[in-house]
Amino acid sequence: MFSPTSRLRSATADTFALVVYCFIIGMAIEIMLSGMSFEQSLSSRLLSIPVNIAIAWPYGLYRDRVLNMAKRHGGDHFLVRSVADLFAYVSFQSPVYAAILWVIGASSAQILTAVTSNLVISMVMGVTYGYFLEYCRRLFRVALP
């Protein structure tokens, strides 16, 4: 239907990956670490779906640029790629996540705990999301950068 280099195909893959990944991981963090109720977390996750739809493709483009810059300056090493993936994820997602929690009425302490936990968990999560995104792009047959 769309060519592997199609922007729509790429945007669809990026959107699918971000919505699925953030829903599952975000709910786990909010309930298990931040002390949010199931209802608060579900509200946050449901609000995050349209937000993630809006930011998924811009994040994918941002991530690709960060990875390309890291590759250009640090080579194509696993560690360089992992640190770049982590930086891209944390620098783009943390402000968005804090805003979502604020909108659903989480307390300042809950927001601080959730965002801080997310930063710590992002040591693995941001890199893991990068691999999940690449997997989804392959599923959608997107030409990888």
From Swiss-Prot:
The keyword Iron does not apply. InterPro entries: Ala_export_AlaE. One of its GO terms (cellular component) is plasma membrane. The keyword Nucleotide-binding does not apply. Keywords: Amino-acid transport, Cell inner membrane, Cell membrane, Membrane, Transmembrane, Transmembrane helix, Transport. Pfam families: AlaE. One of its GO terms (molecular function) is L-amino acid efflux transmembrane transporter activity. The chain crosses the membrane at residues 16-36, 42-62, 86-106, 111-131. It is found in: Cell inner membrane. It is a multi-pass membrane protein. GO terms for biological process: amino acid export across plasma membrane. It comes from the Bacteria. Exports L-alanine. Belongs to the AlaE exporter family. This is L-alanine exporter AlaE. The gene is alaE.
